[in-house]
């Protein structure tokens, strides 16, 4: 990719930075300069994230020396230990900086784990009086991943040794506390891998560093409580994550680095299990925790399920899988571009992308015909759910699912046997001396002739699923064909249900007419059945075969491949996401209204009270000394925050010199909301009602936003997130190539953006040419364009009316934003990535280059991220607004990456395959379940191109698609109104799909969703609090006054009878209709009895003797 492209992006960034700096210099914001530092590479990103000078230069030196990321992380630790970095720091500070910097390097300087996941380090005393090192981990360490978590402990040990600190020597009680605590955490939260009790004991007994942590859960341990060296009885999530997902799971990686660096004291790793990998084969894990309304599409490896097809389309890879748009339609439109599916293999989940060039579903129509639907336009009724129910009686086969080799490589999953598809046949035909061009579809006679003349297997179009039937069924079908009539190339047989069922299992397309089964183009079928004009040519006892596939190979005299040896089970996960990011309730401005703002937090309502008392930041003017909360004083000077110790009252910028606690500028003061709002409206020349603020501020200093920004946001209907920015969330989908018509951008506009030639080197002239996507360009949902247009109008008003500058965007329609710069940001991270908008699609997803997603440390298995206009972030983001609580700095652009270097993105992108064709040797390797690493040399991967010009361009793909946004616009999970409607559709679909056991689905829905919900609601009703309808205050017990002590408002229950009964009736009905187990029915009956006894009067009516007469 040309340097001109990156220079163009950076030139646009410099232009917007200049405007933002001019605006910020007016002193109307917490700081007088833009608060998002720019980073050009990983080294600079790490340094700016951890704020330690000299780190970037040292990382670059390690890169020159050729050190891997892990080796560099340990070398950084040595630098801190030996004083080359962090000069003048205390022992604990040096250790703290070493661990944070190492974790930042291991996570590409993107995630918040280094600053949020490591709370602090400390020293403790062993029983022998020696000091040991404690590292306090917090919940956000999860975002670092297991390898970084484990290596952080190794770095801590490395630095500990250099500083002469003794190893940790736990007591037996402390060891058992870890065993109990990790087990309890597993019940409360998800763990990728749960070590056995003995493995936990081994880790804690031998780890030379004490893995400590902050309490993250409300639950407390019940056994090993009040231990002298353990500061809390509550569950510490950090210790469970680092011990289980870190050390236990990533043992082989730690061991490798321990051996390479010659660090002693870690030999105990050999007795751990760790790195548990699924060894292939069928697994039903994806069916766990089934949710009502989210259908199962196929049980594990079941005939009729998705057939595995290897390859990558231009909109798949990086965990996204391709499915024919017709399949999406046929499945009651539960699947749409971006919908997450939980899959059997190769990974745990995938996002769905439409690929029209793979096979669609095979269905039985209500008239008995069996057809395959590859093109939805051929069956106009397919887009209507009602018409689907009228026209389809059974979904016999779901069609193909396109999975790339790179996804098997990334998951280290043995290659599953490939389906026999055209691209495999083409490679065999090419090796035999033929030219496969134009032969993707051939008739039966041609298929037989090519097979005989060239000695290649029968063409996939006429290779049926013989492995799905038994020898008895083969015998039955041969008899029926022999008794039938051959009319030219067609076969006519008497209509018999058992014969038709065998044909359906084979996926033989046929019609039912006048009591006859009609198979057109039947010559290959007859050849495989050993039937000709004279009838059947074989007897069962003559066969030397133990299965039908082997038998048809003998009977036909041709090579017949297994058409679909691998089926992939799957169910629906999360629906696709395309929506604005909102806090709850959504505010226009981070300005406190207190209880005076009412339950809607309206600034206008608070202003009616005149003065209100709230906690805000105390600021002082350096010129005139006046104190208040405004950023600019009436005299025109920019004010300064005044921090003081909340305990001692001593004023200090960071920590109290007397007691050492962190200072804050947050002060309870009376503020004139009425006057402030009136001045804001007057200065802007606006009159806006219903400006939503917040109840209170959660940042360290309780810093409020200028009220003028809220006025303008309310005017344009724009809402704000916790850091001052306005965001739009979208499901991630990959895209390496596109057609101009797919993104709604004209050829002229694309030429202006630098898209001058297509992938074949031809000048761009038509909107149907395929172009290679530049790595920092993105294509968004059209709804996102509408939202960004509103934000752009707010920004222009802000520049003109608040900052006194010229408007920047001047946009009247979403297309006017094409070419504008934005920031992409993933949850749990702290580094935004610069990007450019080039178009819109109808799909509810965000398309971007795999590098762009990987730069945010995301893949495309259903993850969702946000985008924001660059100018919005530069003007409105401030660290001063971020919540002070743990995790407050996550999901905030603390640093901005301006140029993507493929070597510095998440390594999953390095396994993206770029070939136009998979070689024949690859398909043959799948038949022996080869390890992906054994065939890595056959496939062109990103990892092989790093450091060359080819790392940015010249990407290939094996399968094209007509439209990257094909299929339904939204999943019906989002469009169906009630949960009952969703579940009804889910169970109807289960009955319709051959690969699904509807009874099992019904049982799983009841057991994993409805029963826990019923029990939880029943428990919640008995423990509920009461709520004030006026101020929303909640009370654990109803006050004796029967009204709100705060405002006198009416109190109501927070859990109602309807909430408890919600799923009872439907659960009983489903249990009866689908014949679930008696155990499940009895559980429902017991809960029904409990609910009835709770809500029905149990008073006994007094009866007399006369009542019985």
From Swiss-Prot:
Domain of life: Archaea
Keywords noted in UniProt: DNA replication, DNA-binding, DNA-directed DNA polymerase, Exonuclease, Hydrolase, Multifunctional enzyme, Nuclease, Nucleotidyltransferase, Transferase
Recorded catalytic activity of this chain's protein: DNA(n) + a 2'-deoxyribonucleoside 5'-triphosphate = DNA(n+1) + diphosphate; Exonucleolytic cleavage in the 3'- to 5'-direction to yield nucleoside 5'-phosphates
Ranges of biased composition (kind: Basic and acidic residues): 573-585
Purpose of the protein: Possesses two activities: a DNA synthesis (polymerase) and an exonucleolytic activity that degrades single-stranded DNA in the 3'- to 5'-direction. Has a template-primer preference which is characteristic of a replicative DNA polymerase.
HAMAP family in alphabetical order: DNApol_II_L_arch (MF_00324)
Protein name: DNA polymerase II large subunit
